[in-house]
């Protein structure tokens, strides 16, 4: 229905771009979920030799989802851009490009919301009928809801989160492209000018080097021989940290390649600062989420201590810690936006009606998600480890196997929180950039926040 509306009222080729984005998002989710359901049994088998042996198998299963999301999102956008902007040079080419992101958003809505509701409904239902009514352990094969619970982990936490981050990633790439196109009122044939090419290609170039860095970082995730949970956590995060380090260096190189000249260093330096600001904020958000959700740090230990007095204090303690954790994340996002704006202003004050600071904010969102491939890999690892524990329980495997999978599952709960932080923060920064793109597209000269019709637009901004 949405594709038909786009074809009738906006641009027929926009419907093609919309459907293409939706298909790629759904394909990434299907591929990742299919592999996750195959990797969980292998993880259970490897857990017989300890968590260190099972960890890399679960991670590699999650890596299929991670690189499917990042790879298809980037490849799809490049195909749409090359086809409609560079080859066909159609009218409204950049509106067609933005429709690609809308298609990804549509699938994300259904996958994230629908999958999340199913996941929690199955999880709570299985616990109520099993633990409360029947008094049997979690994942016991006598409880038929166990299967629904395990399926829900894949639907919500693999396909759902993957679609969410696919949409965030595609949106973060489209935001600076549409901002440049609408602010400078570019047509497809004008996109080949030297300055315009650099501004339009820079976001995709950063995403490309981030993808390569993620692939290199993923090879470094190995279980080793230690069974200590801290060592396992370090092994899992090693790939992410290395990928971010490589991306940081490559970002500087790309910025100087596209914007550098013999007598001007402000433009590449400023844009590199903007992207690196987003990259550092993304890393810091991950560490913040880890601090508040990992059993290695005081917040979770305090909640565990409060459990000794009953469920009420546990719930209150968990809610309070969750609310406190938001403060640090908000401060980090504000700092990241400020640094990105300063970097953009350092790069250039104004090109036409394109503000350098706003462009800096737009590319900062790409910095946050540049290493999306390895971030989603770490996130999708969690449901695989959780399912492995369920399989161990249903198969009546020895207790040490379940202990090994529980160790991996505990780590997976933390990594899931990290991915949620990435998704929300990047979406917030991307939304800010897209709002300015909207402003340029409809010709708003100013915004009066006291007017009820704030988002109403007409052909003439003064109507």
Located regions from the model:
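Hydrophobic packing and interface segments
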Residues: 1-458, 462
């Amino acid at each position: 229905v949405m594709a038909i509306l786009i074809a009738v009222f906006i641009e027929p080729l926009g419907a093609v771009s919309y459907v293409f984005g939706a298909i790629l998002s759904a394909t990434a989710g299907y591929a990742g979920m299919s592999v996750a359901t195959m990797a969980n049994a292998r993880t259970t088998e490897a857990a017989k030799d300890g968590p260190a042996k099972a960890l890399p198998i679960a991670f590699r299963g999650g890596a299929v989802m991670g690189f499917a999301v990042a790879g298809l999102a980037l490849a799809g956008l490049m195909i749409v851009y090359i086809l409609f902007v560079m080859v066909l040079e159609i009218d409204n080419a950049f509106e067609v490009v933005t429709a690609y992101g809308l298609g990804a958003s549509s699938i994300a809505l259904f996958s994230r919301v629908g999958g999340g509701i199913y996941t929690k409904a199955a999880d709570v239902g299985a616990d109520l009928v099993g633990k409360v009514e029947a008094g049997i352990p979690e994942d016991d094969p006598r409880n038929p809801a166990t299967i629904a619970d395990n399926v829900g982990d894949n639907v919500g936490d693999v396909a759902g989160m993957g679609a969410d981050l696919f949409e965030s990633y595609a949106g973060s790439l489209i935001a600076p492209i549409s901002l440049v196109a609408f602010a400078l009122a570019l047509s497809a044939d004008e996109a080949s000018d030297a300055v315009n090419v650099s501004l339009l290609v820079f976001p995709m170039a950063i995403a490309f080097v981030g993808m390569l860095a993620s692939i290199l970082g993923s090879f470094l995730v190995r279980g080793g021989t230690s069974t200590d949970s801290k060592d396992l956590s370090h092994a899992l995060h090693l790939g992410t940290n290395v990928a971010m380090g490589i991306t940081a260096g490559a970002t500087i190189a790309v910025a100087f390649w596209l914007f550098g000249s013999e007598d001007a260093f402000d433009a590449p330096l400023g844009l590199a600062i903007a992207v690196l600001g987003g990259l550092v904020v993304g890393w810091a958000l991950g560490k913040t989420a880890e601090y508040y959700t990992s059993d290695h740090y005081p917040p979770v230990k305090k909640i565990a201590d409060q459990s000794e007095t009953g469920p009420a204090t546990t719930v209150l303690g968990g809610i309070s810690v969750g609310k406190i954790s938001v403060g640090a994340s908000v401060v980090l996002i504000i700092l990241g936006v400020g640094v990105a704006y300063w970097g953009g202003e350092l790069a250039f004050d104004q090109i036409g009606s394109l503000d350098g600071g706003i462009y800096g904010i737009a590319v900062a969102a790409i910095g946050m998600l540049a290493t999306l491939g390895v971030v989603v890999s770490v996130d999708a690892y969690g449901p695989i480890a959780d399912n492995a524990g369920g399989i161990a329980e249903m198969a009546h495997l020895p207790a040490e196997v379940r202990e090994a999978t529980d160790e991996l599952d505990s780590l997976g709960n933390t990594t899931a929180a990290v991915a949620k932080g990435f998704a929300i923060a990047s979406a917030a920064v991307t939304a800010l950039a897209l709002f300015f793109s909207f402003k340029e597209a409809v010709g708003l000269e100013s915004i009066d926040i006291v007017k009820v019709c704030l988002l109403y637009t007409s052909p003439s901004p003064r109507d």
